[in-house]
Regions:
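Short amphipathic alpha-helix that is part of the acyltransferase structural core
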Residues: 1-44, 51-59, 160-163, 172-173, ...
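Short strand-connecting beta-turns/loops that link adjacent beta-strands
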Residues: 43, 55-56, 71-73, 140, ...
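Conserved beta-strand in the GNAT
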Residues: 49, 57-69, 74-82
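A conserved beta-turn-beta hairpin within the catalytic core of GNAT-like acetyltransferases
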Residues: 68-78, 88, 109, 138-141
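Conserved acetyl-CoA-binding loop-helix of GNAT-fold acetyltransferases
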Residues: 83, 88-103
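Short glycine/proline-centered loop/turn elements that form peptide/ligand docking sites
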Residues: 97, 119, 138-143, 177
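Conserved GNAT acetyl-CoA-binding A-motif
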Residues: 104-118
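Conserved catalytic-core motifs of GNAT/GCN5-like acyltransferases
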Residues: 126, 131-148
Length: 194
């Protein structure tokens, strides 16, 4: 299996055709959804996919599309997640999600990630840091839930900021205690000197 991650303009015509064929085979035919898969959002997305050789042609074994956030909806969206029928009993989906999360974090480190998944797959996505945000709701007649994975860098930045604030206060308290011991008095903020 050969893994790829690229923007739309870097997809070859052969790879694009294989991706659209796989998306239609799984998301339209297998899932019995009557919708237009080509929705005009592919040009601005990252495409994470795996190909396998079948004779002379390469077929898409796994695929996920990653849409960037914007001013109205800042969350990055992972959608069109699929694996071919031949890759459903192995760890291909796990590898796909790991690669999609890595690509999304590299491209948009400060953004939360959102996805819509079949309600029965919630536990699987929780393994990757997603939590239920809303739903269930019906999508093409099947129950789905919206899941979100909080931004990691923003959370890390907040932890750093809080840690610095606590450390700075602790340092000021230590300095006041040391100053008080050196001069034989309590720190001014203790209230005992009043």
């Amino acid at each position: 299996m050969e893994w790829h991650c690229c923007e739309f303009e870097h997809l070859s015509a052969v790879d694009l055709y294989a991706i659209l064929r796989a998306r239609n085979a799984v998301l339209v035919v297998e899932d019995a959804h009557t919708h237009l898969d080509i929705d005009g959002k592919d040009a601005g997305a990252l495409h994470v996919y795996a190909t396998q050789r079948q004779g002379d042609a390469a077929e898409v074994a796994a695929y996920a599309r990653i849409l960037p956030g914007d001013d109205i909806d800042p969350d990055v969206v992972i959608d069109k997640v699929l694996t071919s029928e031949a890759c459903r009993d192995d760890d291909t989906l796990e590898h796909l999600l790991e690669r999609a999360l890595t690509a999304a974090h590299a491209a948009w480190p400060d953004a939360a990630l959102r996805t819509h998944v079949p309600a029965a797959r919630q536990a699987f996505y929780k393994q990757f840091g997603f939590r239920k945000a809303y739903g269930p709701f019906l999508h093409q007649g099947a129950p789905f839930v919206g899941m979100i994975r909080p931004a990691q860098r923003a959370a890390g930045a907040l932890r750093q900021l809080l840690s610095r604030a606590v450390s700075a206060q602790r340092d000021r308290n230590e300095e006041a205690r040391a100053d008080g011991r050196a001069h034989g008095r309590l720190a001014a903020d203790s209230g005992a000197n009043r």
